[in-house]
Amino acid sequence: MIILKADYKKYNVSELEKLRMDEEKFYETFDNAILLQTCNRVEIIFDADSLEEIKGIENIDLEKFDILFGDKAIEHLFRVACGLESMIVGEDQILGQLKNAYLKAKEKGRISKKLEKIILKAIHTGQRARVETKINEGGVSIGSAAVELAEKIFGLEGKNVLLIGAGEMANLVIKALKEKNIKAIIVANRTYEKAEKLAKELGGMAIKFDKLEEALRYADIVISATGAPHPILNKERLKNAGKTIIIDIANPRDTTDDIRELPDIFLFTIDDLRLVAEENLKKRKEEIPKVEMIICEELERLKEFLDKMRFETAIKELGQYIENVRKKEVEKAKKILKNKNKPVEEVLEDFSKALCKRIIYDIIKIFENVEDKEVFECLAKEFKKLGNKNKN
């Protein structure tokens, strides 16, 4: 197997964007290949032993990619599936992206039996890692840490969540919020159209910014993520809010410190969240050795399967080779019987000798090409056993 790899470790997002390929053109060009493209990586997975045997490889700028071969390529793929090669260690999204890449290749009929087995084993390994270890537990982004903190302290099920802001920081919490069983999500933003768009994505409702005080009275959890140059939430504005958790992930801050004086308000800032995220990331990294053990186990199982597959393929090819030799010798024998006045017994004798001679000649050539002494001795031993068996 061969993998061409370009990822966030070597390129920024805009540079990776230039390396992305059109999927339709890719699958029109390449056989036995899978294209894996995310915002942080572009990887091409080939079922091939050398670059020279890949038809269409000249269409790829190989200098832009790191190239992995054989066992190293397979191990890398398993690490990718487990989230060990991700920017955020253990993230779940890559597993879904790998599945989708596999399904696309399968749909196009561009995947060999061997490559399919390797990909499915990688996906299975990624699933095992997430079930048997804590590699994907705990929010490690500011957005997911905000949601995790709210859930730990107050619980999210059946709660009303107010999201203030609809910019980049607000988008950090969207995915994490979607997965929770929240009673209602309200989005407030100075530009109502942006609030409306975000609310639609979250299955919530949008309000105009002048309705913020009213929304604050009903909210159990407030996540503030505006791009305002000055605080928008202070003690005076929140004095009638009741028991509320406020999570401020804006930079600069959306909240003032005097909010902490209110007995029913629990305020957490981006600094608190950063500590949560860093602690969670540390815990994930502690799980890496356990994941690597799972990878080793699954690689060993895959090796056993691939060895068996290679053996079955070799036997099939050997059978085809013998059949081809047999057909040629049969045709020769038929011509002799037709054109020459020779006894059938003699023709059959000549036919069997010619068949054996041809096969023995090619077996000798195989022995001559074996460079590994142990392999040579093993083959010689087995052929000797075969010879002794036929004497009895």
Curated annotation (Swiss-Prot):
Substrate binds at residues 38-41, 86, 91-93, 97. InterPro entries: 4pyrrol_synth_GluRdtase (IPR000343), 4pyrrol_synth_GluRdtase_dimer (IPR015896), 4pyrrol_synth_GluRdtase_N (IPR015895), GluRdtase_CS (IPR018214), GluRdtase_dimer_dom_sf (IPR036453), GluRdtase_N_sf (IPR036343), NAD(P)-bd_dom_sf (IPR036291), Shikm_DH/Glu-tRNA_Rdtase (IPR006151). Its EC number is 1.2.1.70. GO terms for biological process: protoporphyrinogen IX biosynthetic process from glutamate. SUPFAM superfamilies: Glutamyl tRNA-reductase catalytic, N-terminal domain (SSF69742), Glutamyl tRNA-reductase dimerization domain (SSF69075), NAD(P)-binding Rossmann-fold domains (SSF51735). Pathway: Porphyrin-containing compound metabolism; protoporphyrin-IX biosynthesis; 5-aminolevulinate from L-glutamyl-tRNA(Glu): step 1/2. GO terms for molecular function: glutamyl-tRNA reductase activity; NADP binding. This is Glutamyl-tRNA reductase.
